[in-house]
UniProtKB/Swiss-Prot annotation:
This is Uracil-DNA glycosylase. It is an enzyme of class 3 (hydrolase). One of its GO terms (cellular component) is cytoplasm. It comes from Bacillus thuringiensis subsp. konkukian (strain 97-27). Transmembrane segments: none annotated. The lineage of its organism: Bacteria, Bacillati, Bacillota, Bacilli, Bacillales. It catalyses: Hydrolyzes single-stranded DNA or mismatched double-stranded DNA and polynucleotides, releasing free uracil. SUPFAM superfamilies: Uracil-DNA glycosylase-like (SSF52141). Its EC number is 3.2.2.27. The active site is at D65. Keywords: Cytoplasm, DNA damage, DNA repair, Hydrolase. It is found in: Cytoplasm. InterPro entries: UDG_fam1 (IPR002043), Ura-DNA_Glyclase_AS (IPR018085), Uracil-DNA_glycosylase-like (IPR005122), Uracil-DNA_glycosylase-like_sf (IPR036895).
Length: 225
């Protein structure tokens, strides 16, 4: 499972691949992928980092673990592959986007357009067994993705961290650099969205911060496929 990241993350994260926790994770993953159906596909595990380089990261949207249904996960938090029904949390994200900007809700949940603009769509756990949520929790991925957050925290150029729900907000302790911005609310899940996600205006808050920094704003509109 050792992966050669082709952008600046490669050099920054190279030491992680040599650490004991990652060696153990690697053994676990090789066994899991050989015995079970695991998502995403091996070649998609690090897509969040592949699509959004360290230098180009403007925003981080932190998720938990990948979708565990067929053909959903492809390495980006909240995003699903083309042709797959939009999951409920992402649908609520689209509803909030519609209310903020008037965009129509798209016919897909493919968020690569965001990733290509500097939105790092990072899950804290990068793999999952089919049909078993959180099945790869506590196996080592958290150490790896914490290091991603720590590296971004070390950056002078500000990063906007979007933390939805308690799981994501637990990572606030890693964001100690006052250069950075944190936007938080309850999770967009149908279980909690009406308790403070709807109306929280995360997308326009991001763009206000970027505009004040003199940075290009994110075009949040996802096109139909």
């Amino acid at each position: 499972m050792k992966h050669v990241l082709k952008n600046d993350w490669g050099l920054l994260l190279a030491p992680e691949f040599e650490k004991e926790y990652y060696r153990e994770l690697d053994v676990f993953l090789k066994e899991e992928y050989s015995i079970h159906v695991v998502y995403p596909k091996i070649e998609d595990i690090f897509n969040a980092l592949e699509y959004t380089s360290y230098e180009n990261t403007k925003v981080v949207i932190l998720g938990q673990d990948p979708y565990h249904g067929p053909n959903q996960a492809h390495g980006l938090s909240f995003s699903v592959q083309p042709g797959v029904k939009t999951p409920p949390s992402l649908l609520n994200m689209y509803k909030e986007l519609r209310d903020e900007y008037g965009y129509d809700i798209p016919n897909n949940g493919y968020l690569v357009k965001w990733a290509e603009q500097g939105v790092l769509l990072l899950n804290t756990v990068l793999t999952v067994r089919q049909g078993e949520a959180n099945s790869h929790k506590g196996k080592g991925w958290e150490h790896f993705t914490d290091r991603v957050i720590e590296l971004l925290n070390e950056r002078e150029k500000p990063v906007i961290f979007i933390l939805w729900g308690r799981h994501a907000q637990a990572k606030k302790k890693l964001i100690t650099n006052s250069n950075h911005h944190i936007i938080e609310s309850v999770h967009p899940s149908p279980l909690s969205a009406r308790r403070g996600f709807f109306g929280s205006k995360p997308y326009s808050k991001v763009n206000t911060i970027l505009a004040n920094m003199g940075e290009r704003e994110i075009d949040w509109e996802i096109p139909n496929l």
